[in-house]
Structure formats: structure tokens, C-alpha cells
Amino acid sequence: MGDWSALGKLLDKVQAYSTAGGKVWLSVLFIFRILLLGTAVESAWGDEQSAFRCNTQQPGCENVCYDKSFPISHVRFWVLQIIFVSVPTLLYLAHVFYVMRKEEKLNKKEEELKVAQTDGVNVEMHLKQIEIKKFKYGIEEHGKVKMRGGLLRTYIISILFKSVFEVAFLLIQWYIYGFSLSAVYTCKRDPCPHQVDCFLSRPTEKTIFIIFMLVVSLVSLALNIIELFYVFFKGVKDRVKGRSDPYHATTGPLSPSKDCGSPKYAYFNGCSSPTAPLSPMSPPGYKLVTGDRNNSSCRNYNKQASEQNWANYSAEQNRMGQAGSTISNSHAQPFDFPDDNQNAKKVAAGHELQPLAIVDQRPSSRASSRASSRPRPDDLEI
């Protein structure tokens, strides 16, 4: 019989892009159909016409009786069956090769865009379009092709056609031959002079092979149906999981990136705004040294330093004779920093600069401290 190596190599490449059911189906096709058909079955049917004898000497009678009994040889019929059930799988393989070719083109274009990006060209939109196309074709990292979108539909269609071909060939075989062979066939056709009996060689052995090939066809049909349900429910499960998983939805290849460079949308994107007020207002002439607001000791020290600075500032204003109502004692109330929960949220959103101790740039003098307790000429007398 012909060489099956070319078909075997093509079908072997499909295993890398098939489900578990598809791999089992290919194993059944290779072992129990192609291998068995090329060895035992072909030898059993090798003498089917030469050993077909009829009880007549009329020339041509045996040929017409054989043609009536076996319109097509069982071996050739099974070869056609194998070819037809393999064609949908080969079409799916062609689609896989098409996707891989698309992947090569997209990767080449992506490399060119990245080179242009290093030169300062804005190609972010083009890179995102390439990622969307890869996701559409089912291309993942490291060249792995995932069954998704058009590739998944092609795989389902191939399973449907394989199942249809299996059923069709089983019905044709039952209509032409049945599923058993008789030892004697009665024939009455021209040029036979009368009704003649024809005898078939090894009918029991051939019947066993017919039943075996019938069982293999039924097993292949059952595998196709199981795989069809598996692919369908797996697709539904992945779709439901993709909708219900918020992490997957926000971290997928199509999720928009955060724009931390725009101060207008910084807070909505989970970024810290560079123009946001990071510390409470200080009295005029004082500077704030930034530090970590989460530190509890630094937070207590800042509170005490702020109270002391406000008190000193009020005393100096009163000493200089300014109106006491300009700064009330309410300004010297302690400043409460936000609670720890709000600090934790801000720290998680982005690194912020927080206030540390309030430092007075003016040097302190003993004369000023002593002069504050001595009476002055312009003091009010009661």
C-alpha cells in the first residue's frame, strides 16, 4: 500500500496544538487505523479478487459477480475514510501555521517600533495595537498559541466535520456491505447463463477485521463528541472566569495603563500629585523640613515643635506691639495628622514627601528671653 509517512508527519504536528481529547483521537488514528491498515488488513484482502470463484466456466461471469458483491474494496474504502476524517484536522493545522506566520510578522514589526521608540518616536499606540492583534490571534509569550477566537472556531468546526464524516462512512459501509461477510454469494447477471454461486476466501477473518474497524470508528466518533463538549464548556468557563475575575480584567493585555504624568488625573489613577499640599501651613518665616509622616516619634515631635513655634511667634508679635487679634490662640492648637489608615492608602498610592520638624532659621538669644520678662516703657499700666 502507499506510503503514509507524509500524512503522519502532518498529523503529528497537530498534537502540539490540540486538546487532550484531540491527542487521544490522533493516537487512535495512527495506531488502530493507519498502522493496522498498512499491515494486517492489507494482507488479509490481498487475494480478494483472485480467490473469488464461481461455479461456472462462462468468461466474464466471475468479474461481474465480484463487481456486484463488492462495488469497492474494503481496504480502499477505509483509506478514503481515513483521508476524509483527517482533512478537517489538516485544515486546522493550516490555520495554526497562518497564525504562526502572523506572529512572525507582528514580532518583526514590534521590534522595528521599539527601535524607533529608543530614538524618541511616540509609538505607544502602535505597540498597543500589536498587543491587541496578538491577543486576538491567541498568541501568548514565548510563541505559544492559545486556542482562542478564530482558532477556537476552526477547531470546533474541524471536530464537527470529523464526526459527520465518521457517521457518513459508517452508514455507507452498512448500506453497501453490512458488517459481516458470507462465504457464498449468489449472482445472476449477464453474461452468466444462469444463477451461479460464488465463494469468498477467508470470510471469517475478514469479518473480524470489519468489526474491529467498526469499533475503532465508533471510538473515534465518541472521542469527537466528548472533545466537542469539553471545548464548548471550557470556552464558556474561561469566558465566565474572565468576566468575574477583576484582577484578570485589570491586569490583562488590554487594560489601560495609569497616567501618572498628568497632575489632573493623578489622584484618579492611584498616583500621587506633585502639586498636592503635603504638610500643614506654617507661620511666616518658618520652613518645614520634609520627612516620613508614618514615623510615630517624628509625628509627636512635629506636633510639639509646631505648638512651641506658634507660641513663640505670638509672644514676639505681642512684644512688638502688634494687634493681638492678628493671631489668636486658636492657631496654636495642635495639628492632627491624618489617621493611619489614610496614611497607609497614600503610601500605597505613591511615594509622598511628608513634613518633619519645623525649624526656625533665626538664632535664639538670651537677651530676647530676658527682655521678655522685664517691664518696658510702652507697657500698659493697670
From Swiss-Prot:
Assembly and oligomerization: A connexon is composed of a hexamer of connexins. Interacts with SGSM3. Interacts with RIC1/CIP150. Interacts with CNST and CSNK1D. Interacts (via C-terminus) with TJP1. Interacts (via C-terminus) with SRC (via SH3 domain). Interacts (not ubiquitinated) with UBQLN4 (via UBA domain). Interacts with NOV. Interacts with TMEM65. Interacts with ANK3/ANKG and PKP2.
Region of interest: Interaction with NOV: 244-382
Function field: Gap junction protein that acts as a regulator of bladder capacity. A gap junction consists of a cluster of closely packed pairs of transmembrane channels, the connexons, through which materials of low MW diffuse from one cell to a neighboring cell. Negative regulator of bladder functional capacity: acts by enhancing intercellular electrical and chemical transmission, thus sensitizing bladder muscles to cholinergic neural stimuli and causing them to contract. May play a role in cell growth inhibition through the regulation of NOV expression and localization.
InterPro entries linked: Alpha_helix_dom_sf (IPR035091), Connexin (IPR000500), Connexin43 (IPR002261), Connexin43_C (IPR013124), Connexin_C (IPR034634), Connexin_CCC (IPR019570), Connexin_CS (IPR017990), Connexin_N (IPR013092)
Organism this protein belongs to: Rattus norvegicus
Induction: In bladder smooth muscle cells, exhibits night/day variations with low levels during the sleep phase, at circadian time (CT) 4-8 (at protein level). Expression starts to increase around CT12 and forms a plateau during the active phase (CT16-24) (at protein level).
Protein name: Gap junction alpha-1 protein
MF annotations from Gene Ontology: beta-catenin binding; beta-tubulin binding; channel activity; connexin binding; disordered domain specific binding; efflux transmembrane transporter activity; gap junction channel activity; gap junction channel activity involved in cell communication by electrical coupling
Glycyl lysine isopeptide (Lys-Gly) (interchain with G-Cter in SUMO) crosslink site(s): K144, K237
Any one GO biological process: positive regulation of meiotic nuclear division
Domain of life, source organism: Eukaryota
Disulfide bonds listed in the record: C54-C192, C187-C198
